[in-house]
């Protein structure tokens, strides 16, 4: 349980982190360097999984000036290329390993759609399928 003073400190800390992210992203965009992102760059979000925390980061990147398509590239193809694994991961192609999610809307139009995951496939196994449940009713 967090005491009220702790909640205030977390909010102030989150604001400082958001400001750092904004400054960092704006410098990246200005420099033109390729950017990769992943769950290891997310700050602490109480009660959220790494995936949820990563999706929570996307609006901050957008608000700092990064277009949604570039955000999606940062966590897929760019990350794979920077790891030197583009032949194995980073895009959906035959022979590549891919964990997949599905959302109802278009994340290029509204990046927060990635916070509303409806389907998850990890390692070839369906982990979550809210789409099938909705259609079977």
Regions found by a protein language model. Name each.
Residues 5, 45-48, 111-112:
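Extracytoplasmic/secreted cell-surface and envelope-processing proteins
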Residues 1-2, 40, 123:
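Generic beta-structure capping elements
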Residues 1-11:
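Metal-coordinating catalytic core of metallo-dependent amide/deamination hydrolases
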Residues 14:
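Substrate-recognition/specificity elements adjacent to catalytic centers across diverse enzyme folds
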Residues 9, 19-104:
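His/Asp/Glu-enriched, well-ordered alpha-helical/loop segment
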Residues 1, 46, 132-133:
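C-terminal cap/linker of serine protease catalytic domains
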Residues 81, 94-136:
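C-terminal cap of metal-dependent C-N hydrolases
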């Amino acid at each position: 349980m967090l005491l009220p003073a702790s909640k205030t400190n977390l909010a102030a800390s989150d604001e400082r982190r958001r400001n750092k992210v904004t400054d960092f992203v704006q410098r990246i965009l200005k420099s033109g360097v390729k950017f990769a992102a992943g769950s290891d760059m997310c700050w602490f979000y109480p009660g959220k999984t790494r995936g949820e925390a990563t999706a929570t980061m996307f609006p901050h990147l957008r608000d700092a000036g990064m277009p949604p398509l570039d955000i999606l590239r940062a966590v897929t193809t760019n990350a794979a290329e920077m790891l030197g694994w583009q032949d194995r991961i980073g895009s959906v192609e035959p022979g590549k390993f891919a964990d997949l999610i599905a959302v109802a809307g278009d994340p290029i139009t509204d990046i927060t759609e990635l916070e509303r995951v409806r389907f998850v496939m990890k390692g070839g196994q369906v982990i979550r399928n809210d789409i099938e449940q909705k259609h079977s009713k």
